[in-house]
Amino acid sequence: MCEQYVARADEPFRIDELWPFTDKLERNGIASYGWGATWLGADGELHSYRDTGTFVDDAKGRSKVGAQTTRAVLVHLRRPSKLSTIGPADTQPFDDPAGRFSFSHNGALRHEGRFRKRFRDAGRLHGRADTEMSARWLEDEWDGGANVPAMLRHLHEAFEGDANLAVLTRDGAGYHYAGNSENPVFTFDLGRIRVASTGIHSLDRSFFRYVAPEATNRKLVPRSRTASI
């Protein structure tokens, strides 16, 4: 199962300020089958990077992304439920073709099969994993970002299953919906950066011992609620 987080600050920061945290999240979350990031650029647009290897081993990618300055970023560390889906087309985050948002997910969506034929027949599927189905659904249902928490709740109601859902919008807002009973979502501060992250499949707060011991303002996001940062 994947790990993911959204992070935001009032003032721009270099993304590699989050790399020590990301390294520990991948190692302790056992997520080493691809990684990706989407960030808000100085041009006001979303920019993305993806690689099918591990974050730890991708020195070139870490350097490229880490050198970027942003106010908001979404990072996804992949451990797919089906290893047969490893590949570029299923590496997250998924970018909205219109540039309105970027989306990632962890867990398993129970009813993704209900939507697969619809999107496949429309020529909108490029991979095989369940996340792409929910990304396409979100593209169709997007209401301009007026109420992202409600939209993520509706997405989870439509697909069901254990799933955490993360979104970064073009205006730099980050959202993390908690819907996975096996992997809680926490919010906390790493210095001046606010973070909403999955919790390494530990139902207690061991996340803060092994991944983010320096975190302050720690809170658990209740199931079926969305953290907005």
Where is each model-derived feature located?
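N-terminal segments that mediate ammonia production and transfer
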Residues: 1-229
